[in-house]
Amino acid sequence: MEFWKLQGSGNDFVVIDDRDEKLESFLKERGVSKEDFVRKVCAFHTGVGADGLILIKNPDNPENDFKWEFFNSDGSVAEMCGNGSRCAVRFAYERGIVGNKVRFETLAGVIKAEVYENGRKVKVQLTPPSKPEEKTLTVDGEEVIGVFINTGVPHFVVPVEDVEKVNVIKLGRAIRFHEEFQPKGTNVNFVQPVSEDTIKVRTYERGVESETLACGTGATACAIVSYLKGLVKKKPVNVLTRSGEVLTIDFSEDLKEVFLTGSVYKVFEGRLSEEVLEY
């Protein structure tokens, strides 16, 4: 089974063209669930290694170019992934599935995208976010003040003075599983203003269950919250991710239009062996 590995801002994904729907029968014949398949392929050391896996499918509505199924590395399904969407668009563009302007279906709704620089840069228009809600949590006896917002998937944004001093794994995990966000939990972001149009972000991702090098919907959540709280004064907002890459977030004042732009890199093409299922 052929696949590509792509990454955007250090967020890496395995992408498979499954428009012929052969994967379902392949897994059924071998008694492997799709969740187990994803976990095995995304596993580092014994699999390809990735933050998530994307299946490109035929669209339900012929007006759209394709539909995707997105899985976190633990096999769970996610409604949306900003960086994953940019990687999916580059894959579809290079495979001749789409042109420079793209519409594709996700569980969060139809996503529009534009391709630049022969696929090396992709701009996606995300679905409008939920209304931001400030919340005060008690975590290990301490108050944590942040803002909850859904930018396709749920995010809790915590402004801090220095993101380098945050124990992202410990605090992020505690917030991710906090009773306030049950049963589905939330992604957790720590944001530090750098200048009037730039922020630095670190993210604990639900489904990956660790800090990731970047998160597109998380960067978007942080940019919106930072602007609304006056931590930055100008748009578009530049987001410095853990990978060192910069994501650019722009949005209308009423938040009905939200755009995420960044570079996408093709890492390699490969073919999965059936032996990956043995681990």
Swiss-Prot record:
Site (Could be important to modulate the pK values of the two catalytic cysteine residues): H155, E205
Annotated positions binding substrate: N11, N72, G82, N83, N187, E205, R206, G216, T217
Keyword check for Isomerase: yes
Pfam families the record matches: DAP_epimerase
Major localisation: cytoplasm
EC number of this enzyme: 5.1.1.7
Catalytic activity as recorded in UniProt: (2S,6S)-2,6-diaminopimelate = meso-2,6-diaminopimelate
One GO-annotated biological process of the protein: lysine biosynthetic process via diaminopimelate
Highest taxon above the source species: Bacteria
Cystine connections: none
Any one of the GO CC terms: cytosol
GO molecular function: diaminopimelate epimerase activity
Active site: C81, C215
Record key words, sorted: Amino-acid biosynthesis, Cytoplasm, Isomerase, Lysine biosynthesis
Keyword Cytoplasm included in the entry's annotation: yes
Signal peptide annotation: none
Subcellular location: Cytoplasm
Pathway field: Amino-acid biosynthesis; L-lysine biosynthesis via DAP pathway; DL-2,6-diaminopimelate from LL-2,6-diaminopimelate: step 1/1
NCBIfam families for the chain: DapF (TIGR00652)
Family per similarity comment: Belongs to the diaminopimelate epimerase family.
Functional description taken from the UniProt entry: Catalyzes the stereoinversion of LL-2,6-diaminopimelate (L,L-DAP) to meso-diaminopimelate (meso-DAP), a precursor of L-lysine and an essential component of the bacterial peptidoglycan.
Subunit structure comment from the entry: Homodimer.
Name the UniProt record assigns to this protein: Diaminopimelate epimerase
Protein species of origin: Aquifex aeolicus (strain VF5)
